Structures are given as C-alpha cells and as structure tokens.
Regions:
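N-terminal, Lys/Arg- and Ser/Thr-rich interaction peptides
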Residues: 1-22, 33
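A short linear-motif detector with a strong N-terminal bias
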Residues: 5-6, 55-59, 101-106
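Long, contiguous hydrophobic alpha-helical segments, chiefly transmembrane helices and signal peptides
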Residues: 8, 35-38, 116, 152
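Glycine/small-residue-rich interface belts in oligomeric ring/scaffold proteins
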Residues: 17-99
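Internal, well-folded beta-alpha domain core
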Residues: 65, 69-74, 80-188
C-alpha cells in the first residue's frame, strides 16, 4: 500500500478549545477536523463560513457538515507529533480587537487573550486508497493550493515540507502477539 507522508509545521498554531471563555485555549496538537479543514482549503472545498453564507442568501437549511468534511471524512490519516513527548510549548498572546462590533463595552475595544502553540510540527500520513486522498497527494506534491493552508487561523501559516510517497504494510496480530500503535507520539 502507498501513503503520502509530509511534515506539517509552523511558527505558531491555534486550535480553539472552547473550555472557558475568559481566555482562548488551544488544543495541544492538531486534531483530525482541523487537518481535514486545512486539506479541504488546499483543494478549494467550502468550509463553515462559506457554507453558511451561501445558504443564508438562498434561505436554505444549513446542512450538518461543510463541504470539506463531507468530501474528506473517510480518508485514513495518522498524525505523529514531533514535539518532545508529543507536547509543544504554549505562549499567551494578548492583543486588541478594536472593530466596533467586537465588544459591547464603551469604545468597542475587546482585549483578546489566546494561548498559541510554539513551533509545532507533525508528520502526517495519508493512505492513498481513494480518489480524494490521491488528489490531496497531487496538490501537496506539486505545491498547489486553492487557499493558503493555516494552522487553525490565518495568523498561523502552515509549512508543508519533506513530501514523499512511502510504502506501508498492513500488520495483523495473532492472539498471542501485541502490536503497539503510536499514532500521536514517535517511538523513542
């Protein structure tokens, strides 16, 4: 079997975690839906805002999932963190959002606090067993993209490096054999 392998990295990343609303936390690693969204952007598929805007104009019911998810949900991926023990340092960023509608406070200034991942890096593997996966491989190998890939939001540009097609083999275990699966952290 063949798989696409590449390293996904950036200076910073922000994958919003909605646990609290006084400060915006980030997930510690890229999650599947964020990765699918980034791959969908590379291929030019619609996301949440594009889907909602188009349907609101037509007074149509908003479907459960955006275009990128409908098209890419079945691809088989593995995300392997290159961080020490799978973790990346986080840094608190504070900035002002001074557009008038950002805050109902006097002056319309909203102070935003976000935790960003510093220098994140992952090895991404995509099994090339369907047309969508092969299309992703074509775009990434040939450095094509409809929309720029980001690591969570447009403040965090994504670097895609070390792109290659690799051979992988399926492992089957017997009753007396254990197979260790390390899909998030590299084996030491």
């Amino acid at each position: 079997m063949k798989a696409l392998k590449f390293t996904l990295s950036g200076n910073s990343a922000f994958f919003k975690d909605n646990v609290i609303n006084t400060v915006y936390l980030t997930y510690g690693n890229i999650h599947r839906v964020a990765l699918l969204g980034m791959l969908g952007a590379i291929l030019g598929y619609g996301g949440y805002s594009k889907q909602n805007d188009m349907l609101k104009k037509k007074n149509k019911k908003i479907p459960d999932y955006p275009e990128f998810y409908e098209k890419l949900k079945d691809i088989k991926i593995s995300i392997v963190s290159n961080g020490k023990n799978g973790y990346f340092n986080k840094k608190l960023q504070t900035f002002n959002n001074s557009v008038g509608y950002a805050s109902k406070e006097e002056g319309g200034n909203l102070i935003v606090k976000q935790f960003w991942l510093e220098n994140p890096s992952w090895d991404i593997y995509i099994l090339l067993d369907c047309d969508e996966a092969k299309k992703i491989a074509d775009y990434i190998q040939n450095r094509k993209a409809i929309y720029l890939p980001y690591l969570g939001s447009n403040d965090h540009l994504a670097n895609i490096m070390d792109v290659e097609i690799i051979d992988i083999e399926e492992k089957m275990s017997s009753e007396d054999e254990t197979i260790e699966i390390l899909s998030m952290i590299k084996a030491s």
